[in-house]
Structures are given as C-alpha cells and as structure tokens.
Amino acid sequence: MTSQRTRERLIQRLCEEGIANQRVLDVIRKTPRHLFVDEALAHRAYEDTALPIGHNQTISQPYMVARMSELLLAAGPLDKVMEIGTGSGYQTAVLSQLVERVFSVERIKGLQDRAKERLVELNLRNVVFRWGDGWEGWPALAPYNGIIVTAVATDVPQALLDQLAPGGRLVIPVGAGEVQQLMLIIREENGFSRHVLGAVRFVPLLNGPIA
C-alpha cells in the first residue's frame, strides 16, 4: 500500500493533471504521505484525494498540494514562506523541502503537536510553528516571500496582504460553501495583482486558537 509503485502511480496522475514542476514532483514522490494519516487510512494515502485527519479537518488532495506549491515557486526559489493551516503537516513537509524556511500557523494545538512530531521523525528542521489564529498570520516575523493558505477564507485577510514582501506571492482559496476559487495574489510595485485559477473545495479558515 505504500510501495514505490503506488507512489509512482500518484506522480503519473499528477503529471497527467498538469503538474510540471519537477522539484515539486520529486518532493511529493519521496514524502511518505502515509505517515500523515491515521493508520486505518494508510492504504489510501497515495490516492489523489483528501482524507480526514480529525477535528473536522482534512489532509489536502495531493494534486492541490502540488498545484499550490507549484504556484508559489513559479517566480523562482523562495527563502521565507508562511503557511496558514499546518493541519497534518503534509503540506508543511513538502514546502520545507522546496524553500529555505517555513513559518507555519495552526489554530488547533493537537493537530500542530502531531505535525511537529512527524516533521522531527522525517528530520525536517527548517520549520517554525506558531499556535494561533491564521487570519492574523505571523506579523512579528514578516515579511514573507510566499504565503500559502490551506483553508478557504470568505475574503482575503488584509493581515496576510500586509505581511507579503514586494514581489511576494499569496496562494489562497477564497469563497464560501460550494463557491470557492483558488487565487494567486502578487504584491506589485503599485498594489496587488489578483488571478483567479479555478474552482476548489477546502475546509473553512476559522478564527481563534483551540487547545
């Protein structure tokens, strides 16, 4: 269920779906997604689907992890990325192998604690975690070259725009209920450019930390 052949089938599917960044594909190939889900779901870890991780949250579909990572890296290497929504830690693990430093914010402490353990097990040590409200970001360590949000916001949080460095890229799902769109926002010299990239389905970005 976690064989190399199973992983290669996933990579082939991602390629067929349009993922072209070889670094992203290589990292997803070698990142053990089965370690980021409950043992009872490990046999489904390399399916291209979201899976429940408890607390009414999910581990994102591999295609969406690849797509969002690819969008973030499209302008070149990044040294400082903020992730909103640590969740299982899978997207965090992928990012940590693609950029120099990851600053990950999660509101549910139980999820974040387990994600920390997984990244330590994988010897991924360029990630710093914050337990807090994702709507606020992490202003004390701003600005960031890239920001990735793994839950849907009803609107783009102004705090995240404020924390984006010049030329920085924000990848975020925006909308409510059934109507959600993936957006790429780039901080330009005279403001922000916004690009709508298609329909998606994410859990909501909620306020307030939970112990």
Curated annotation (Swiss-Prot):
The yes or no answer to whether the keyword NAD is present is no
Q: Sorted alphabetically, which keywords does the UniProt record give?
A: Cytoplasm, Methyltransferase, S-adenosyl-L-methionine, Transferase
Recorded GO cellular component terms are: cytoplasm
Q: Which domain of life is it from?
A: Bacteria
Q: Which residues form the active site?
A: 60
Gene Ontology BP terms: methylation; protein modification process; protein repair
Q: Keyword check for Lyase, yes or no.
A: no
**InterPro entries noted in UniProt:** PCMT, SAM-dependent_MTases_sf
The cellular location(s) given in this protein's UniProt record come to:
Cytoplasm
Reaction(s) catalysed by this chain's protein: [protein]-L-isoaspartate + S-adenosyl-L-methionine = [protein]-L-isoaspartate alpha-methyl ester + S-adenosyl-L-homocysteine
Q: Which GO terms describe its molecular function?
A: protein-L-isoaspartate (D-aspartate) O-methyltransferase activity
As recorded in UniProt, its EC number(s) are 2.1.1.77
The protein's job, in short, is: Catalyzes the methyl esterification of L-isoaspartyl residues in peptides and proteins that result from spontaneous decomposition of normal L-aspartyl and L-asparaginyl residues. It plays a role in the repair and/or degradation of damaged proteins.
Q: Which PANTHER family match?
A: PROTEIN-L-ISOASPARTATE O-METHYLTRANSFERASE, PROTEIN-L-ISOASPARTATE(D-ASPARTATE) O-METHYLTRANSFERASE
Per the similarity annotation, which family is this? Belongs to the methyltransferase superfamily. L-isoaspartyl/D-aspartyl protein methyltransferase family.
- What name goes with this protein? Protein-L-isoaspartate O-methyltransferase
